[in-house]
Structures are given as C-alpha cells and as structure tokens.
Amino acid sequence: MSTQTEESQVSLSEVHRSVAIPRNVGLLKRMLAFAGPAYLVSVGYMDPGNWATDLEGGARFGYQLIWVLLMSNLIAVLLQTFAARLGIVTGRDLAQACRDNYPKPVGYVLWVLCEIAIAACDLAEVLGTAIGLNLLFHLPLIIGVIITGFDTFVFFLVQNYGIRRMEAFILVFVGIIGVCFTAELFFSKPDWMGVAGGFIPRLTPESLYIAVGILGATVMPHNLYLHSALVQTRMVEQTEEGKRAACRFNLFDTAIALNAAFFVNGAILVLAASVFFRNGLVVTEIQQAHGLLAPLLGTTFASLLFAIALISAGQSSTLTGTLAGQIVMEGFLRFKIRPVLRRFLTRSIAIIPAVIVISLQGDGGSYTLLILSQVILSLQLPFAVIPLLKFTSDKSIMGPFANKAWVTVLGWIAALVIVALNANLIVDTIRNWIASAGPNAFWLWVTVVPFALACAFLLIYVAMPKSWRERRRPAVPLQIPAISKVPQHYSVIGAAIDYHTPTEKVLSHAQSLASQHHAALYLFHVVEGAGGLVYGKETLDEEARADQEYLEAIASELRTSGLKVTPVLGYGRVTTELVRLAKEHKLDLLVMGGHGHKYLADLFFGTTISKVRHELGIPVLVVK
C-alpha cells in the first residue's frame, strides 16, 4: 500500500497492546497484569557474559567487587525505569525516539553501534550455551556452538504463542537459575563478614578491567531499547492517571526483577570468592570453575547445577536478544524482517568468530571472548544511556512525566560514572597497544586513535542540548493532518482467487465493494504449476483449463447480481503476476486472502501479501 498503517509505526506490532489490564480488581491482579517485561529484561543481566566477569572478579579479588555489582544494579534499575517511562508515556521505544530526534547519519551510526552490542551479547550466549552443553554432555565446544544455531526454531515457536506465554517461558528459566545458585551458596559456605565488607567501595588498577566488564555485563545497552518496547504490550489507559499508574507498576516490576538478577550475579561472585579465592586458585575459564566445584565442595551435585544454570542463562538470553535486535532494526531503520531470519543473521555473526577463535586457541579462547564481549557492551553503553536520559528529561517529549531535577541529577551521575570508567579503560588499552606494537604503532595512530576520537565527538554531539542542534522532527505530531472529506471512490477492483485462501470471504468483500462503488470487478488467478512457470500463456494443461473453467463459473454467478465481472488468468510466479495484472488493468483496490501460514511454513513459503503490497501503490485489502 502507498500509505503506512498505524501498525507499522509501533514497537513489536505483533504483540503491541495485546495484554489487557483488568479494571475494578484488586491491587495484586493489576500488578500481575503489568508483571513480565522487566523479567524478560532481567535475563540479560544474568547471561553467560556475566558469569565470566563475576567468576573472574570473585576468583581474583575475592569479595572486593561486590560493591560494583550493587552500583551496577542500582544504575540498572534507574535506567530501566527511564526506558519503561519513555515507552509508556510517548508510545515510542528508544530506537524510534533516537530516529525522531537526531539526523539520519547520527541515527545510522547509533544503530550500527547498537547492532555491535547485540552481536557481542549474542556471542556470549553462544559461548555460554556451548560451554554448558560441553559440561553436561561432554560435547566438543565447536559442536556446541553449531548446535546453538538451531535454537532459532525454539524462539520462533515460543513467539507464536504470544507475549504472556513467552514471559512465562522466560520466568521458568529465571527460576531454574535462582534455585541452582541458592543451592550453590548453601554448598560453598561463604564468609558472610567478608561478603559484607565487599560492599565498601575500593578499586585497584588491576581490578578496573573486570569492574568495567561487570558494569557492561550488568547494565546492558540493548536492554534499554528492549524495555521501552516491551512495556507497550500492555493496554495502558491513554490518560495521565493511567500512565502514572503504569509507571508505578513498572517501577515495582523492574525493582523486583533486577534485584533477582543482582542476587544471581552476587551469588556467582560470592561462590567464586568462597571456593576459588579462598583456596588460592585463579580461575581463567568457566570449564575450570565447573571442574573444581565438585572436589572443593565435596558433591557432584554442585557441578551439575552449575551446568544446568549456565544452559538456562544462555537460552533465556537468546530470546530477549532477538527481540532487542528486531526493535532496534525496526526503530532506527523502519526496516522489518521476519524475527526468525533476524535470529539466523545475528546468530551467524556470533557463531563465526566463536568457531574461528576456538579453532585457533582451543577451549581457553572461549573465556577470553566472553570477557571481551562484556567490555564491548560496556563501551557501547554511553551511546544508549545519554539519549535516554536526555529524552526522559525533556518536557517537550515527556510533558508532565519528565524527570524531576533530582532524578535528572542522579541520571547524569550514573552516566558520568559509566563514561569515566569507559574513557579510562579505552585510554589504558590504546596506550598498551601502542607500547607493545613497536614499528606497527603507526597503523594504530591512523586507525584506532581516529576512531576513538570520532566516537568521543559523537558522544559529545548526542549529549548536546537540543537548542544547539536541529531536531529532525518531534517525537509525536504537533498537529492533526488534514483529512479529506471527499469519500474514496474505487472504479476498478481486483480480487485474487486462490484455492488455499478463504475464497468465499474474498469474493464476498469484493462483490460488496464493487456493488457499493459501481466498479468493474476483475477476478485474478495465477497458474503456478510446471506448465504455467515454463510456458506461461502457452500452457494448455489440465490445471490451466480447470482454472479457467473455475473462474468463468464464479464470474457467471457474480454477474447475476448486476456486476461487470472479467475473469483473468495469470501464469508463473504469483507475486510477479498479481503485480503485473493489477497494473495492466489499472486497479484502484486489490482484495486478497491470507494464507494463514504458521510456524515453519511461513518461514519457507513466505507471504505473497507482503511482497505484493510493497510492489503496488494502491490499497490492498487482506481478508482472513
């Protein structure tokens, strides 16, 4: 169609406003109706990448970095609350808000950075699941990495059952992880006084790299995009009171879900500190941690729970990572592809480097990749946090829901902490690279240094007040567009007839519209068999003759109601022929039936409707 529908402008259109909020019920039932989005977000805070940084932090520095986890969790609650408020109040997710408020080139760069972060997160999920399969079933890591490519189908099946079923599915994984680590804490018998001392802030140059990794693993940039879209699955009353209630319930949901994630992360770090640091063991990979748990704790049950929790973490993060990728691509680019294909693409990007590194460095390379993936996430974080903070503090975007002054100050303190830690890490890393590069340092000066400076300038730009830069357009229209009072008239209407679609309904709608508008009606059917594909109009096979007789019979029946009906056969590919026939006969409207493909059928056969709709500049009425 030539115009964009309202559905194409919303986040996750398949589930947008699909969950009803009951009225005149108790507080608990209303809270449960809003519960869910934060739990989908929370699994990203306990994915395998967190395990790598938490394990190394606990094994190398004991309980010393617990305060970093606490700070990261508080920052996460604050930022995720901002993201939820943005989605509830404006009806726009963070990616759409960036597209609305920044020039296209800046939006494209922000999109690329976000895609890199999602790929880094997916890399952690691939490696985590593969390691879990290796620990549980003794599969080689490379085989495990390849197997993770097939979890795309799991996502596809779960998504088709609706957002509430998906939330329940994820909650099961969260519960499994929580139970496993509660048992691990019981087995490890930590020093609780030492745990309490870990909440006192202190940081050394050696622990900075791990601290930034923990920050990147705990506060994940793509989760901000995800949360701002997921809250729109609820049918929130579009009044100030309704939005305020939704913001309160989502704050409660976020606090509970992210504190559950904090418990899991804290349990991993405490487990590593009480088992490995206490025994003077330096853990360099997850497999090593798994192997040491049984002899050190005196039970094989500890190792089994560890592997089960790791697989659960990887698989639950897979689902939410795909949703985030879909939101980012649609929000920044207005480009929509099937989620399952999006999953294949993202997973392929993650699998390739994993296979290469494991092939070259062996199983030990997987742990290095996990740590690196979390640092990449942390470095991308400011490019999501600062726009979010600016949008939610802007009264022209949020109206009466804009952040209060003290909340804005807290937000900027969190943003400055993130930027300062990242800047320190980047400067130290580049300095070390140059110092160890020798004669090749020149290439670092002309590639890496300019890239880092460009990123710094981009960050300054997105942080600038809107009065210093031109906004592309407001997040919502400032005035209602003029609507023509002249009724739409259709002179020529086409109906696409297919044995596999609801033919009776298509004909009923086409007949009704043709009668109402006194329009000429064309009946189209495309011969898809071998004869039609190879010989086109020259085909005279039994299928073509039967199709011709079928169309003539329908046309004769419709003519009895006084309509001018013309049956037309097409030959070859359905989409190409329907577009050609519609243009040849100068249609004003095309009526089609939906196939209703589900699951794998829709992936492999595709949708004729979507392809025809994008090729034609006329309205297309889809009948199911």
Annotate the PLM regions:
Residues 77-89, 231-241, 259-288:
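Extracellular/periplasmic helix-exit of transmembrane alpha-helices
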Residues 169, 340-345, 369-426, 430:
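C-terminal membrane-solvent junction of multi-pass transporters and transport-like membrane proteins
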Residues 152, 173-200, 208-229, 388-396, ...:
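Hydrophobic alpha-helical segments and their helix-loop junctions in multi-pass secondary transporters
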Residues 483-537, 541:
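Small/aliphatic-rich secondary-structure junction motif
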Residues 592-615:
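Glycine-rich, Arg-bearing micro-motifs that act as flexible, cationic patches
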Residues 104-107, 142-145, 256, 303, ...:
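Loop-to-transmembrane helix boundary motifs in multi-pass membrane proteins
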Residues 475-484, 559-590:
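Structural beta-alpha unit
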Residues 41, 68-101, 110-116, 316:
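Juxtamembrane transmembrane-helix boundary signature
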